[in-house]
Amino acid sequence: MTAVVNIAAYKFVSIANPADLREPMLEQAGQRQLKGTVLLAPEGINLFLAGAADAIEGFLRWLRADARFADLQAKYSESARMPFRKLLVKVKREIIRMDHPAIRPEAGRAPAVDAATLRRWLAQGRELVMLDTRNAFEVEVGTFRGALDWRIERFTQFPQAVRDNQAALAGKTVVSFCMGGIRCEKAAIYMAEAGIEHVYQLEGGILKYFEETDGAGFDGACFVFDERVALDAALAPQA
């Protein structure tokens, strides 16, 4: 059986009229029989799609022909069956809701650490605060060993959690992480703007870490928002 290719991708970039992209996105993804969700907002694009390998690559070529998305990077995994039931393209206020409009990731990112570098830091025992920016129910499925978990129920609670815990992070090196990179990017920017000096974001999130390393230092599986539920370090649905 031919495996279904799954991609997760996002990019913070100004989109003046995101509603104008909805129909072209539906048409291009639909004609390739892709399923999943695409979120569009003035701050950018966030997508989770699945389908045949050539269809996925064809859609990405079409999307990257738009200069705004030319350098969009995708995280890949495979599954034995389609993990989504339908195709949705939605226009939102934010591609990841924080309810903090002053945070504009496209205006400048926090420093990022790539998967291989983080793997090396963890193996060396480097002093890090691994901060899980995901919801509590996601953390319960799996997280980095010893990670800090503020037990938030939704990402809009993250700014208050920073205010409540900021003193404990003073002088420490913080690596924010999440499923695919989008939440940890916003989180890292917020913390840096709040005055936390040494903040990194895990480039591409847990999924990219699994894709590019052996998953060392991560206990359990990564929760995903589709019918696969959770992926292990080999990016296979957890048994």
From Swiss-Prot:
Ranges where the Rhodanese domain occurs: 124-214
Enzyme class: oxidoreductase
Catalytic reaction list: uridine(34) in tRNA + AH2 + O2 = 5-hydroxyuridine(34) in tRNA + A + H2O
GO molecular function: oxidoreductase activity, acting on paired donors, with incorporation or reduction of molecular oxygen
Active site: 178
Gene Ontology biological-process entries: tRNA modification
Annotated SUPFAM superfamilies: Rhodanese/Cell cycle control phosphatase
Keyword terms: Oxidoreductase, tRNA processing
SMART domains per the UniProt record, alphabetical: RHOD
Pfam families (UniProt xref): Rhodanese, UPF0176_N
The family this protein is said to belong to: Belongs to the TrhO family.
HAMAP family in the cross-refs: TrhO
Name the record gives this protein: tRNA uridine(34) hydroxylase
Organism name: Bordetella parapertussis (strain 12822 / ATCC BAA-587 / NCTC 13253)
Gene that encodes it: trhO
